[in-house]
Design a protein with these regions (language model features):
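Disulfide-bonded cysteine-rich modules in secreted/extracellular proteins
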Residues: 80, 86, 196-203, 255, ...
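Acidic, metal-coordinating catalytic segment for phosphate/diphosphate chemistry
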Residues: 37-83, 217-258
Length: 388
């Protein structure tokens, strides 16, 4: 019985860390996009309350947690990283997990550096995607692109050339084939202590106040999400253990996801963006608490009305490896997909898309494509046709 109680309390602590991370991101993203004075004050208060939630379970004091949260200046999304699986000459497999950051080099640079050190080929594409949120780790939400390498070095020699795994990425983190990565997290009902319920009630009151005062559709969506999170928690008597919730100051390389949806004739669905009038693959920012594959599926539905399933990963697209450096959202996970029902009609989101078109590869060459999509659209066609 004592073991069962301890396990339940541990799950509740990790769940609270996850919730705090989601609310941290909602506050940071709302502040990034800008708001009026009253809404900005509410978002800053949300940030404070999110830090107070984490202080119920993390070993660090509230002031330290809040300082980390207040340092957020960019968009917060699941953080990209790599899981390198290196098969050595002596039969040992080494595994190294590290996040990407804005200062430690691009995805392409990391792969090239590691391959050169191990005297092996640069891996061309990830074999799987791992996700710390799906694994139940309490660290900031991170997805890991899994690459496999082989080296003629033995394990001690190879290990000496590699940076160690970041401590908060240690543990059992299952990986999924990219085509199967649109997993809906099932963490169950979050059990919370009475003091946490009080904090969530305060957050829900902020959301209610925002909904009464703001007409901005994106901010209203945000506040509805926040209110739903607060409502889903269930108060109970429990005692939280103190846990390590990972590197709260880890640099977030903001990540988006898109879905290149193909029909049975091999045509690609593009939308005309309402803001620029250019053509693009449906996509947008990934949200903390959702796998990047699920973000691609969600964005396709929100912008086109189509229910889709992933068929693969076209490109883990680090814009910093191109001339399209983008401080706002440097990383894009570009998936291929198909509609679950080929007869399902399109239903465009007017705020996002003014038109949509199924196009061939040849037709795509004559379109005015949104920045970055001039690279991603040909890559999607090549992936769909099995050319890469």
């Amino acid at each position: 019985m004592a073991t069962d109680t301890a396990d339940a309390n541990g799950r509740a602590a990790r769940g609270l860390a996850r919730l705090s991370g989601i609310l941290r991101a909602e506050a940071a993203n709302g502040l990034f996009w800008g708001a009026g004075p009253d809404e900005e004050a509410r978002l800053r208060r949300l940030r404070e309350l999110a830090a107070a939630l984490l202080a119920q379970v993390d070993h660090r004091p509230y002031e330290t947690i809040l300082a980390a949260y207040e340092a957020d200046t960019g968009l917060r999304s699941p953080m990209p990283g790599t899981e390198l699986r290196i098969d050595c000459a002596d039969g040992t497999r080494l595994v190294r997990r590290r996040r990407l950051s804005r200062t430690s080099g691009t995805l392409g640079q990391r792969l090239e550096t590691v391959a050169a050190a191990l005297r092996t080929r640069v891996p061309t594409e990830p074999v799987a995607i791992a996700d710390t949120d799906l694994a139940g780790l309490p660290c900031p939400h991170t997805f890991l692109l899994v690459y496999e390498l082989q080296t003629h070095l033995d394990a001690p020699a190879a290990a000496a050339l590699l940076e160690p795994t970041e401590p908060d990425l240690e543990g059992d983190v299952p990986s999924l084939n990219p085509s199967a990565s649109a997993v809906v997290p099932d963490h169950g009902v979050l059990q919370v202590a009475p003091v946490v319920k009080q904090l969530l009630d305060a957050i829900a009151a902020l959301a209610k106040e925002s909904l009464a005062e703001t007409a901005d559709p994106y901010e209203r969506e945000r506040q509805h999400r926040i209110a739903a999170l607060c409502e889903a928690a269930e108060e109970t008597d429990l005692e939280y253990p103190r846990i390590d919730c990972g590197d709260l100051t880890a640099d977030c390389v903001s990540t988006g996801a898109d879905a290149a949806v193909f029909d049975e004739a091999g045509r690609l669905l593009l939308i005309r963006r309402t803001d620029t009038g250019q053509w693009a693959v449906p996509g947008g920012a990934a949200e903390v608490g959702e796998p990047v594959g699920l973000a691609a599926v969600r964005e396709a539905f929100e912008e086109t009305g189509l229910d889709v399933e992933l068929t693969g990963l076209s490109w883990a697209f680090d814009k910093r490896d191109t001339k399209l450096g983008d401080d706002r959202m440097p990383m894009i996970m570009s998936f291929t997909a198909r509609a679950l029902d080929p007869a399902q009609p399109l239903r465009l989101a007017e705020l996002e898309a003014s038109d949509a078109r199924w196009i061939t590869r040849e037709e795509a060459e004559g379109l005015d494509l949104f920045r970055g999509h001039g690279l991603r659209v040909p890559a999607a066609f090549a992936r769909h046709r099995g050319e890469r």
